[in-house]
Regions:
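A conserved helix-loop-beta module that forms one wall/lid of the active-site cleft
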Residues: 138-169
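Conserved NTP-binding catalytic cores of kinases and kinase-like/nucleotidyltransferase enzymes
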Residues: 26-145
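Middle-to-C-terminal accessory/interaction subdomains
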Residues: 45, 56-58, 89, 100, ...
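Positively charged n-region of N-terminal signal peptides that target proteins for export
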Residues: 1-4
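C-terminal outer-membrane/trafficking sorting elements
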Residues: 534-578
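Insoluble glucan recognition modules
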Residues: 428-537
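Internal "kinase-insert"/substrate-recognition segments embedded within catalytic cores
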Residues: 116-118, 127, 132-134, 154-159, ...
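C-terminal segment of classical bacterial N-terminal signal peptides
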Residues: 13-24
Length: 578
């Protein structure tokens, strides 16, 4: 049965939402090509202009090319410009990634600025990635979902990403995501930076930043797992190891492996591996069904000190997620060897930690994620259409973000339900939140009216800031009638029927035109498609319903069903008292 996904009035993450709000606020009409037929930026997002010396193309991942850049906010006053066409700033650029570099014409890049810069509102740094996400068929939402969950589960640090359009050497390259790189830094992975070739016993205990890797091309150490498979650890910090450092890292990973494959009732493992961060990290991989996690792009870090533990994180690559309905753990029955994940899942203490964290973080999680993704899609949809046009000859792009949004939201709803069932966590009663956004001053009689098959009809009044209404019900279906406060006895809104409500649902009432006189203006519930506002009030004292489905309204104290051709049926008389 089709599920309605609706906007939440809950606050989104302050670190992410402003970029989306500004992008949609300054959206312009799509202009795909210029007069000479060349595809141009959409004008709805900031544009990063990069020019290499002599226009040399970026062809490898090993050698930085000298270049310049400037960032044009495209009229968005919330974003700081860096450089200009006349006075660009110095930059170095090279390729990055593995499959995403080899498999697609739309390439990802690594940037190294000449000096630290707080690009697109992110923490100032010299090091950023430009991720192309050419391998993401789900509306560029894979990393967006993974990073959202990481922040929600409060992992110590989560990379930030911001949408931007890229013009490289005068060629429009489409929609990219400027992303913070995983590095040892006070604003990223905040641990002591261990020097290369260190030999001192105390110093080689940390800090360490390593990656469980599925490629053996980078400097690494390798051990044989308890199941006979080889596991590779690429070290990021330090970058060049002494004999002592190599021995320390190898011994540490070997000890973890021995304990992970050892007695599942023992608690000794948790003396060396942080169980809280592991559980938070694990939940992100499980909910997104990231079957490549614990196989590649899987980071661990350790602070300096003999008593310090290893921590899983930060999250990074979600390029294989959100594909099919969630029916099994991410580490079972997959093509990749997920190293330690299956063994870790067998520890009762770890399962208890997963359940405790899920009980803590799952309420309203999916409702908030729905709202976040809605804002995300609205911010990039015009640029995504340009991107799809730019790369259509290559057979990739995301031209239908609304369809992608439906898929991702459905996937995450199903995954959350699957996780609740697996951990034995009973979801809370669904809460229906009604939010008004009037254009003019409304009276205190603004309200909503709810009723169902097994509940008595009642009014719902404000509980927060005078504009937010909350009503909790398990009655299915539940009907909601939104009532205009100024003219509440003579006009109202359409009714929404909710089927199979299992999550918190939120409805936002939009005033499309000023309500300067009775029976004028448009009011509707903003739901998933959000594309049409139906006007039921264009004839004085006679409601006109042009929809195929009857609409319930409040008129002169009576609850009416408005049929086609302006006929109605009286359901009953209502009082303005609760």
């Amino acid at each position: 049965m089709k599920r309605l996904f609706l906007l939440s009035c809950c606050a989104l993450f302050a670190l992410t939402l402003p970029a989306f709000e500004s992008a949609s606020t300054h959206a312009q009409t799509l202009n795909v090509t210029s007069s000479n037929g060349q595809i141009e930026p959409s004008g709805t997002l900031p544009v990063l202009f990069v020019n290499t010396d002599n226009g040399v193309d970026v062809v490898d991942k090993e050698t930085y090319l000298t270049a310049t850049y400037y960032l044009d906010p495209m009229g968005d006053t919330t974003i700081t410009a860096f450089g200009s066409k006349e006075t660009p700033l110095p930059l170095q650029i090279k390729g990055r990634g593995n499959w995403t570099w080899r498999g697609f014409e739309k390439k990802p890049y690594r940037l190294k600025l000449d000096g630290k810069a707080a690009l697109l509102g992110m923490k100032a740094s010299k090091h950023f990635a430009l991720l192309a996400h050419a391998d993401d068929p789900h509306g560029f939402m894979r990393n967006a979902v993974g990073f959202f969950l990481s922040e929600r589960f409060e992992l110590p640090w989560t990379p930030k990403q911001r949408p931007v359009e890229l013009v490289l050497n005068g060629d429009y390259r489409g929609l990219y995501f400027l992303t913070e790189l995983i590095r040892v830094d006070k604003d990223r992975v905040s641990i002591t930076e261990q020097p290369d070739l260190c030999i001192h016993a105390d110093s080689i205990t940390g800090g360490w930043l390593v990656e469980i890797d599925n490629y053996d091309t980078d400097p690494h150490v390798a051990i044989t797992e308890g199941d006979g498979e080889t596991i590779i650890f690429t070290y990021k910090t330090p970058e060049v190891l002494s004999t002592e450092q190599t021995r320390f890292l190898t011994d540490e990973m070997s000890r973890l492996d021995s304990l992970i494959y050892g007695d599942k009732q023992s608690i000794e493992l948790w003396q060396y591996l942080d169980i809280d961060d592991l559980a938070r990290f694990f939940l992100v991989q499980e909910l997104t069904d990231n079957y490549e996690s614990f196989h590649g792009s899987c980071y661990l870090y350790r602070e300096m000190g003999a008593a310090e533990k290893w921590h899983f994180g930060p999250v990074w690559d979600f390029g294989s997620t959100l594909n099919h309905s969630k029916t099994q753990p991410f580490y079972e029955g997959r093509e990749h060897h997920n190293t330690w994940a299956p063994q870790l899942a067998l520890f009762p203490a770890f399962q208890d930690k997963l359940k405790a964290l899920w009980e803590l973080y799952s309420p309203n999680l999916i409702t908030d994620l729905d709202a976040y993704l809605q804002a995300f899609v609205e911010s990039i949809e015009t640029a995504a259409a340009n991107d799809a046009e730019r790369w259509k000859t290559q057979g990739y792009g995301n031209a239908d973000l609304e369809q992608d949004l439906v898929h991702v939201q459905q996937f995450m709803h199903d995954a959350a339900l699957w996780e609740s069932n697996r951990l034995g966590v009973t979801p809370p009663e669904p809460t229906i939140t009604i939010r008004w956004r009037p254009l003019n001053e409304w009276t205190d009689k603004q309200m909503a009216f709810v009723w169902g098959e097994s509940i008595e009809a009642r009014f719902v009044k404000p509980v927060q800031d005078g504009d937010c209404y909350t009503y909790t019900s398990t009655d299915i279906p539940l009907n909601i009638l939104f009532v205009n406060g100024t003219y509440w006895t003579t006009r109202g809104n359409q009714t929404v029927d909710i089927n199979n409500l299992t999550e918190d649902a939120c409805f936002e009432v939009l005033a499309d035109t000023a309500t300067t006189a009775p029976h004028t203006g448009k009011h509707a519930v903003k739901a998933l498609d959000c594309s049409t506002l139906t006007d039921h009030f264009n004839t004085p004292y006679l409601y006109n319903n042009t929809e195929a489905t009857p609409v319930k309204v409040l008129h002169n104290g009576q609850l009416l069903i408005i049929h086609n051709q302006r006929t109605y049926t009286v359901l009953g008389t209502l009082s303005d008292e609760e």
